[in-house]
Amino acid sequence: MQTASDVVRLAAVSDLHYSKTSQGSAQALFAQITESADVLLLCGDLTDYGLAEEAKILAKDLAAVGIPVVAVLGNHDYEAGEEREIAKILGDVGVNTLDGDVWEYRHVGFAGVRGFCGGFGRGALGPWGEKIIKDFVHETVQEALKLESALARLTTDRRVVLMHYAPIRGTVEGEPLEIYPFLGSSRLEEPLTRFDVTAVFHGHAHKGAAEGRTATGIPVFNVSYAALKANYPDRPPFRLFDVPMNGAEPADVPSIGERRIGGRRRSDQRASEDSSDGPDKVRSAASSGSDGGSDST
């Protein structure tokens, strides 16, 4: 038997690209997420030019969010060299910005890193040749090690990973082939296979696929705002998932006000009743949100 307290509902979105003129642009999205989820995940590119001024505007909108917020920064958030100030500004309104850090909510632990690029599989860049190439690969390796260290510190039954760059090729498919090496790295996948990770959320790939799996079957979700708009044109641009305490994978949320408990649709008011085991296949759905976001990765 599972009750509502045995399930954590996650809302996830990425690449909001807040600019100096974005005040209020995501208020409707944040309001609906607050009503629908237990935790909000933001997977990078929170600002457009990496300016503290942009982060302050986003922070004003996030201050009204009535649920915990967990975030990682993306490449745009590093553009102006103000990433530490951005993290502090967001932290002042309660956002848990992870960079090799962990955060726990009930039975779910969250590990977050920015990640980096380099390509996937046999096409991945190797540390050979000029120093700048070696430094490039080293950055990705360091991000992977940082993720591994964070996962090792989690003691929760379920482990969820946030990153900005993609850990698998599957969720960047749809992007121009020539930019694959700059969208993520399969080196980020390696730590996921060493731990019992429940699900992975990332952004960055604006034209990528909505979901995929690692080689070992871990579900990976691309929650880039632009990708959600493109992949689900009839759905608002954020996704909701229920993470049960048992071994079931994250399940889709059929609609606002309902919670899938152990694989059977129940209203929240009836969530304390008995239910069957969870689904054996990840399903996903978008829930209500608002327009906005940038086209750049």
Model-derived regions, located:
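Active-site neighborhood of phospho(di)ester-bond hydrolases with catalytic His/Asp-centered motifs
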Residues: 12-14, 40-45, 69-75, 96-100, ...
